């Protein structure tokens, strides 16, 4: 008879490494050698949600408001530069088209 550890799991039995399983799977060494299916012992405890990104939170509303205002100012500056570049590109394109049409009309 096999010995039982302090957690109630027989020796030679290990926990599955897969996080996608919905149950804890304990596999006995002999079962693994004989290519037999693993034994399901008990259900998995509830999962703990871990945030993907740890965003530091300001301690006060005033700091949060100031941080939000600073981010909005940066965003507005970037959008302003993008709008200026798009306007410049459009004006340049229109000037090029007008110039090419004017020169092609003179040739005829």
From Swiss-Prot:
Residue ranges, Intravirion side: 1-77
Subcellular location: Virion membrane; Host Golgi apparatus membrane
Modifications made to the protein after synthesis: Phosphorylated.
GO CC aspect terms: host cell Golgi membrane; membrane; virion membrane
Superkingdom of this protein's organism: Viruses
Main localization of the protein described in the UniProt heading: virion
Residues exposed to the Virion surface side: 99-108
Keyword tags: Host Golgi apparatus, Host membrane, Membrane, Phosphoprotein, Signal-anchor, Transmembrane, Transmembrane helix, Virion
Transmembrane segments: 78-98
Membrane-topology annotation of the record: Single-pass type II membrane protein
The protein's assembly and partners: Homodimer.
Family note: Belongs to the varicellovirus ORF1 protein family.
Protein name: Structural protein 1
Natural source organism: Varicella-zoster virus (strain Oka vaccine) (HHV-3)
